Amino acid sequence: MVQAKTWTLKKHFEGFPTDSNFELRTTELPPLNNGEVLLEALFLSVDPYMRVAAKKLKEGDSMMGEQVARVVESKNSAFPTGTIVVALLGWTSHSISDGNGLRKLPAEWPDKLPLSLALGTVGMPGLTAYFGLLDICGLKGGETVLVNAAAGAVGSVVGQIAKLKGCKVVGTAGSDEKVAYLKKLGFDVAFNYKTVKSLEEALRTASPDGYDCYFDNVGGEFSNTVILQMKTFGRIAICGAISQYNRTGPCPPGPSPEVIIYQQLRMEGFIVTRWQGEVRQKALTDLMNWVSEGKIRYHEYITEGFEKMPAAFMGMLKGDNLGKTIVKA
């Protein structure tokens, strides 16, 4: 019998998550029925959205999330033993599936690319960057793009796609190490928002003419400052609001309606699951090719050990990571 370890939400978050919010449980999995497979987690993802999505869980539920898993036993001919899949299986070491919701890695996945990239640059974060920039912002060559949390899993891909499309890219991050990384990736301007005397002045210096596109991962006062510097007909893709996720008090006021009206700005929130089928497959192929060709670079922040899932999650929310946070089971 296989023992499955699962991290559950012991208590709903109040403010910043702590170890006491999580509980590790062990259950014995039953034998497989016909049509089922037994999966073993290889790599698991922790992402900012989980902080918000956990509100919908009941206490005692498994934490949600994607993982790269291997089929270790199969009674389903579509998924023979050894098949590598990506699926929303949550924070669990082993699971049983009837095959629904399991996505095989593309047959053309290059041997030189780590499997964990299917949770990062060639997975949900990469797709988020791709569609947010190209569809929501409707990016055009020659425009100026601003992205915050730019050294993270999504932001780092946003900046590199924008450069591929012939744009000027300004990125902000929360440490000098991250700023150096952004410059290595080819960002035109990058600065540490925590150490500049004035965010408003730093943004204006980076692009005196303002910004055509703003890819927002942070929200809050940061975004209120940016919106004042958007060009007429500017577009804003609202991907996340990590500055607000752990607040216990009221949120700060939003941006000035007058600015949005008279600058004729377009703001749109989005969730990447909107794009499915052929468009999603094309995006994954584009991302995979760009990475294989060295046009998009990546960095993974890997924590070893399934037992460290909560620590990796909390570290990611604090900004400890450079690039995509991954747990190797």
UniProtKB/Swiss-Prot annotation:
GO molecular function, a single term: 15-oxoprostaglandin 13-oxidase [NAD(P)+] activity
Native source species: Rattus norvegicus
Sequence positions bearing N6-acetyllysine: 178
Designated name of the protein: Prostaglandin reductase 1
Matches recorded under CDD domains: leukotriene_B4_DH_like (cd08294)
Gene3D superfamilies in alphabetical order: Medium-chain alcohol dehydrogenases, catalytic domain (3.90.180.10), NAD(P)-binding Rossmann-like Domain (3.40.50.720)
Assembly description: Monomer or homodimer.
Its EC number(s): 1.3.1.48, 1.3.1.74
UniProt cross-references to InterPro entries, sorted A to Z: ADH-like_C, ADH_N_2, GroES-like_sf, MDR_fam, NAD(P)-bd_dom_sf, PKS_ER, PTGR1
Residues that bear Phosphothreonine: 18
PANTHER family named in the record: PROSTAGLANDIN REDUCTASE (PTHR43205), PROSTAGLANDIN REDUCTASE 1 (PTHR43205:SF7)
Family according to the record: Belongs to the NADP-dependent oxidoreductase L4BD family.
Induction info: Up-regulated by 1,2-dithiole-3-thione (D3T).
GO biological process, one term: prostaglandin metabolic process
Domain of life of the source: Eukaryota
Disulfide-linked positions: none
